[in-house]
Amino acid sequence: MVDFPGYNLSGAVASFLFILLTMKQSEDFRVIGPAHPILAGVGEDALLTCQLLPKRTTMHVEVRWYRSEPSTPVFVHRDGVEVTEMQMEEYRGWVEWIENGIAKGNVALKIHNIQPSDNGQYWCHFQDGNYCGETSLLLKVAGLGSAPSIHMEGPGESGVQLVCTARGWFPEPQVYWEDIRGEKLLAVSEHRIQDKDGLFYAEATLVVRNASAESVSCLVHNPVLTEEKGSVISLPEKLQTELASLKVNGPSQPILVRVGEDIQLTCYLSPKANAQSMEVRWDRSHRYPAVHVYMDGDHVAGEQMAEYRGRTVLVSDAIDEGRLTLQILSARPSDDGQYRCLFEKDDVYQEASLDLKVVSLGSSPLITVEGQEDGEMQPMCSSDGWFPQPHVPWRDMEGKTIPSSSQALTQGSHGLFHVQTLLRVTNISAVDVTCSISIPFLGEEKIATFSLSESRMTFLWKTLLVWGLLLAVAVGLPRKRS
């Protein structure tokens, strides 16, 4: 018999034979699950099942249900009791072990009140002593949402714009338009977003060139359930409504506001009309979620974007004349950009665009000397708290721009910019230079002046002082030794 250093071959053979004799063979221990995906509707209960073969009791076998990691299970059943220590938090109190069938190796787990987050793959894992087996199951969650709503914008130069909206769908639905003959119409834009519950909101926009004799349908299709919901709009009928002949106006110039100030977004109907029975909506680029929605005399909080909650106030003193102002409290850099103001009644709306420019003048620039490179100093100009991104040139006393050696603009967590710029001092004959930080469209700037000549003299005197001290030490040491 051949022996390897530190290893006994006869002992290894004995261990191998022991394992063969004690290990359960895979052909005698199998786990099977459903042959097809399990379909469950949002809000319903789902039953996940699997079976141990050959059929035998699973009372003293560990059964573990998990999603992706066995260490964080959906449910664990061991020695006849539920084990909850490592259970995923989102399944606590929402899963139920079904006892029926465990004597024959059948196990089942019921998940109550199915949500979109439950969609996907699950694993059923058996552990009995030294052997384990598992199988996977696919749970398909589906939900039919609301029937689509079709909103029509009053006629414009390019035709009539239709916006189809639907919410509460899962998975992501398909939205398409059809004419009166059932032929597909091409949407000009589509938008989908998942809400906090995982359900989809869908929006599709269509432009109809010939609105004189058209009925148009919008259909929303669930690809899992192969079911759909639809709505039809008659354009000639809608063109006779009140809002089709009105216009919405807003400020002709951009609205300028500084960070921390309150924003005023005003829009009004022309000619004047009472808007008390209308829906008025301010949004960014899509109808949902919105900045603020007024409907039936009240604010609709459920449609509001999270970043505007608690920050909007509607001024409706002149609502009977069709004039409304939305106040957004304490402007932030993220508020900067385009807004839309929409008046809607009987699914017909008119809109105006508003351009909001949020600005912040930062701190006065500070110039420090960062040392030297190739025998020259490196003046650095820095400042905090700017928005939008500022313009940061160095200039000589004649106003001519001097190229910087580097410039860094970083945006902080609140959206404000911090700027740092280093001056290229090589071959500069200027005595003084300025660091100017400005926001071009605001027409304001902050300036700091730096004297190169004084800094060179200060730098020279510091250098001479250091050399003088070194020389004194060098001369004094030999005398002390003597």
Curated annotation (Swiss-Prot):
Membrane-crossing segments per the record: 7-23
Pfam families (alphabetical): C2-set_3 (PF22705), V-set (PF07686)
Protein topology in the membrane: Single-pass type II membrane protein
Keywords recorded for this protein, A-Z: Disulfide bond, Glycoprotein, Immunoglobulin domain, Membrane, Repeat, Signal-anchor, Transmembrane, Transmembrane helix
Illness association: Sarcoidosis 2: An idiopathic, systemic, inflammatory disease characterized by the formation of immune granulomas in involved organs. Granulomas predominantly invade the lungs and the lymphatic system, but also skin, liver, spleen, eyes and other organs may be involved.
Family: Belongs to the immunoglobulin superfamily. BTN/MOG family.
Protein name per Swiss-Prot or TrEMBL: Butyrophilin-like protein 2
Originating species: Homo sapiens (Human)
Gene: BTNL2
